[in-house]
Each structure stands twice: as structure tokens, then as C-alpha cells.
Amino acid sequence: RIAVNLRHQFFAAQAAYPQMKAAGGGSIVNFGSISWMNGEGNFNAYTTSKAAVHGMTRGLARDWGVDRIRVNTVVPGWVMTERQIKLWLDADGERQIFENQSLKDKLYPPDIARMVLWLAADDSRMCTAQNFIVDAGWT
């Protein structure tokens, strides 16, 4: 799980750094998960690796801020991807969504994409080292 959930984000950021520095700055957006914030059980490697993404984000933001490189994490809730719907969404899952989320609607990929686009844009120029939670109020 560490290789799947953490390493690629570190190596991608590391590879992008020289070009972003040369360009005078940029934005790196990592992906976390609300699972570690909620203390989900039976997913220890997954939740540990997703918590590590937050630590990595804050460390890189501190190190690279001097080069005007912003580093943030988008933390999605239960997003209704085709895979999620096919493999895990059932009547109990629907009940959990509506019991736990403050906004009583399903979360879809475009909801996450809009946050990523905002973080990539200059509109978020003073945002770095942060977790941006897009979970309809679950956490």
C-alpha cells in the first residue's frame, strides 16, 4: 500500500520540482483520504500511507515554498466512481453516506476535479501545506 498510495506522489513531486523552480513556481496537488481522519479499521497500511501523504505535503511545502512552489493535498470523501459503485456501494453504503455527510448528496469525480483545478490556478496562490477536504462534511 505504501508503494501505491505514497511513493508515486513523492517521486512525481521530486521530478516536477526542477522545472517548477526554473519556471518561478507552481502547484503540486497530492491526494489523501478521509479514512485516516476517521480512524477507519482494517485498513492499517492504507490509512497509514494516506496520513503520510499529509506529512509529506507539509514538509515539501515548507522546503519548496522559498521557490514559490505550493504543495497541497486534496482529501476526498466517498466519491461515486464507477469502481466504488460497482464494488462497494450497496443499501448500507447509501445509508452511511446520508447519515455521515452534512450535505445529503453523493460526491462525484467532478466535485474533486474542481478543487484540484482551483489549487492548480493562481486563485489559490497563497494556499500551501494544507489538506483540502472535499467530503460533503463527513469528517
Locate the predicted segments by residue.
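A glycine/serine/threonine-rich, flexible loop-to-helix segment
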Residues: 42, 66, 78-101
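Residue(s) in the substrate-gating loop at a strand-loop-helix junction
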Residues: 33
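Alpha-helical segment proximal to the catalytic Tyr-Lys
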Residues: 18, 62-66, 125
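C-terminal substrate-recognition "lid" of short-chain dehydrogenase/reductases
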Residues: 106-134, 139
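Active-site loop-to-helix junction immediately N-terminal to the catalytic Tyr of the SDR YXXXK motif
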Residues: 39-47, 59
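A short hydrophobic alpha-helix cap/turn motif
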Residues: 21-22, 64-66, 79, 120
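Active-site helix of classical SDR
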Residues: 13, 49, 57
